[in-house]
Amino acid sequence: LPSPYNQYTINLTDPRGKDLHELIPNFLRGKNFDKSRLWNKIHYDGPAWVTNVSRPFVPDKGLEGCHLSLWASHGRYFNGKQWEWQRPYLFCTTEDLFTQTIVVPFLIPMLEHAGAVVFTPRERDWQPRETIVDNDIHTESGTYQETTHGAKWSDCDTPGFAPSQPTLKDGENPFRKGTARQIEATSRHSKLASATWTPCIPQAGRYAVYVSYAHKDNNIPDAHYIVRHKGQETHFRVNQRMGSGTWTYLGTFDFGLGESPQNCVILTNESEHSGVVTADGVRFGGGMGNIVRGCSTS
């Protein structure tokens, strides 16, 4: 710059006030790279988020213990006037639809069979029916029950899930609209207790099972969930120290029609750790979109 401007310090910013120098990638920064952008150590040695303890094998290599976030492409969004696909139509389909036909039935199971825990914010279950059983609202969707033997259930002092009635508007978080329950964990048989979610299945078929729970500083890392599907039982250990305030996927199972003790989810307070077990809503099936924008839903 010509004099006298070469004596000035010039800062370039975008409309949001962000310094444009921050947009320079580390690859072009030479020795003055930004350490805050580095992954550093990402290996996790703690208990997995979800462990199927009924599976007949435990991978000793592969992706065992790894946690992956995976999106099955894009989806529908509200453009200010209507809901539409994010990607353009091409050869009678869109990326939003076509890619998930590869990711959901093939890629996700492959990663899970190799030992990984896969979290996908986009719904993975194509079951259009949905049943939610929650401690806050007793409806025809199912029944929530608690049993106590020495230890007692109580309300959490942190928010929990409550089913939306019937839709969600902008800014609403269903995981902060209700309450959750808690109980002390124990290894003593005399103090064992349980919570049971028994759904009223609208049509026999395969349904994904999701559980939710509240965050507490002393949550245990091995909450014991039992999924009873057509009388068979599959046992899980869920690390409640992570993943609270969302739907935690356990698996997809065959369920019979109607409400039956042969189709339910059970959570016990049995644990090898001291702390609390928290219980909230349980969802069966993927369902349909219920987000309101304008005068229509997703």
Regions of interest found by a model, annotated:
Residues 193-217:
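A short beta-strand element within beta-rich, extracytoplasmic domains
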Residues 178-201:
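Short beta-strands within extracellular/lumenal beta-sheet-rich domains
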Residues 1-74, 79-86, 285-297:
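Non-catalytic propeptide/linker segments at domain boundaries
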Residues 250, 282-284:
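Extracellular beta-strand elements of beta-rich domains used
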Residues 265-276:
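Short beta-strand-plus-loop segments that form exposed binding edges in beta-rich domains
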